[in-house]
Amino acid sequence: MTKGNRSALSSPLALLIRALALTAIVGVLATGPVTSTATAETPAQFIYRVSHSTFGDIGSYSNTVEPSRDGITVQTRAHFQVSMLGVRMYREDATRTERWQGNRLVSFQGVTDKGDGPVEVKGEARGNGFVITSSQGTITAPASVHPANPWSNNFLTSNTMMRPDSGKIEQVRIGSGLETTVKIDGTTIAAVKFEIDGSTKYTVWLDGRGVPVKFVADDDTGKVTFTLAKCIGCGPEPTQIGNR
């Protein structure tokens, strides 16, 4: 890529990268009229396709939830890629592991590669806090901190989120849940809509199982949308309203 092309694209791509942090929205949800899936008594996997209103399909995102006697382990895989005219302009690959005991995060380990080499973030519960170590140093977050990752709706009480790619902490404001409907692959289903005010404006829809079926970040680059493509072990299908 020429220096000129890189300069012309750097601004929207930088904003797009920030927009991809929209996974924060479920990690900081307030209580609402949805059915809790926080207990995670059986294994489950959530697979999302990711699209951008300008760049089109840009990748996939998945969470695999594995309960055990000692708590819950969440394995996350992410792959994002932006191409224009057949030329790759941006990519991001990430693998992350969270370990939970009840509603407390006890450890976190993530590796993110945005094309400049892997960047590692680690965290562990210590006393009344959660100690996060990254390339930017070591900080202590509140014990209630949650990673920006939508694996269930048990993240109902924390307004503090951790960016999994950098380890940065952010405070957010959460709106009340609104009962509504949302279209997923042409099918209209009942859902609860939340709006979250952080560094970017976010919207998330949870179905009656408490599963985040869709979430969107909207900024001046356009909309980045995560849509649930497959949900393994999630229980009965959500209520459908109308036909495809």
Spans of features found by a protein language model:
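N-terminal secretory signal peptides that target proteins for export/translocation
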Residues: M1-A14
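Solvent-exposed, non-transmembrane regions of integral membrane proteins
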Residues: G4, G32, S51-T54
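Bacterial N-terminal signal peptides
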Residues: L16-G32
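Boundary at the C-terminal end of the N-terminal hydrophobic targeting segment
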Residues: S36-A40
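Solvent-exposed helix/loop surface patches that form functional interfaces
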Residues: E41-Q45, Q109-A191, E195-D197, V216, ...
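N-terminal mature ectodomain segment of secretory-pathway/periplasmic proteins
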Residues: T42-R126, G210, A217
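Gly/Pro-enriched, hydrophobic low-complexity segments
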Residues: F55, G71-H79, R91, T97, ...
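Short, surface-exposed beta-strand/loop "edge" segments at domain boundaries and coil↔beta transitions
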Residues: G56, F80-V87, D116-V121, G137-A143, ...
